[in-house]
Amino acid sequence: MTVESTGFKASDVLAGNLQKVLTDVTALSLVGKQLHWNITGEGFRSLHLYLDDVVDIAREASDEIAERMRALQVVPNGLPEVVAQRNTLPTVPETIIKTDAAEELAVAAINATVGTMREVHEKVDAEDSASADILNDYIRRFEQQAWFIRSQNGQA
């Protein structure tokens, strides 16, 4: 951490940790839409709508995290090849998916994203509590969405 005449500047460690989160939330928005478009079966409508909520939160998170990175004088990278190569989310099939399988995939993708946030949280908080507060908010929101999705079939 350094404070310069231009303000607080993130260390390479903080920048790298925020980039990991940015990569996963960006991937989550894509995975969420892939599932949203290709689900079929019982409970379609409610899962379809839950996935829209997940995507909306993921897009909001990616924007907030990227803008926080810029405020800390870091260049965020949301390029498709970076997101594709570096995200930690499970792979989603390129086919029609039954709702029960889609629920499992959605929860796994959310949990992977939250896992990344929890993994980097302590190091982020040690350097920048404001960035850690952002992570706290999205951890709470994503875990709530995972609970909603699991609960619709009595899995919570």
Language-model-detected regions and their locations in the chain:
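Charge-rich, acidic-biased intrinsically disordered regions
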Residues: 2, 6-9, 45-46, 52-53, ...
